[in-house]
Amino acid sequence: MECMAVNDISYGREAEIWPRDYSMLARRVQFLRFNDIPVRLVSNNARIITGYIAKFNPKENLILASDKPKGNKRIEVKLESLAILEELSGNDAFNLSLVPADGFNLQQYTPSRRDYFSICNKCYKQGVGIKIYMKYGQVLTGKTTGVNACQVGVRTSNGNHMQVMFDWVSRITSSDYAE
């Protein structure tokens, strides 16, 4: 039996740039840090840190998360392990939670090295929502706010804004897509 190549943009294309260029994400991280906006960080293995960005080192692709803005109790978060960066609104009720860095940064899955720019850009231009299937099983839905080679911005139904890293995505479809 012949093996056919999948030509479906919802499964992404091979990334042109590797390792990833996090410069666009770095700008967002700095904004969140300077404005003391609470965040939810989700790792590639579904571990969650809810707190603040206390410090950011763009040269090392490293976020230091804390339970307080500019706090001293810091957990190292490697951008290479980050699946989702969600901005929490001031109206959100949330519990601060920190997990050990070695558990958060543990790479349970191999990075996909896939680029989902085409499907995200198409949904953005058509004004339709997207549905994101994460490698660890979570399914996210929302409206795309922009896309680049390594992540997509998504506004969720509760109004929160998140950045979803392509390396931990298995598929992206439009929200109106039905199999």
Swiss-Prot record:
What InterPro entries does the entry give? Answer: Flag1_repressor (IPR003223)
Q: Provide the alphabetized UniProt keywords.
A: DNA-binding, Repressor, Transcription, Transcription regulation
One GO molecular function term of this record is: DNA-binding transcription factor activity
Task of the protein: Transcriptional repressor of the FliC phase-1 flagellin.
Name of the protein this chain belongs to: Repressor of phase 1 flagellin gene
**Which organism does this sequence originate in?**
Salmonella typhimurium (strain LT2 / SGSC1412 / ATCC 700720)
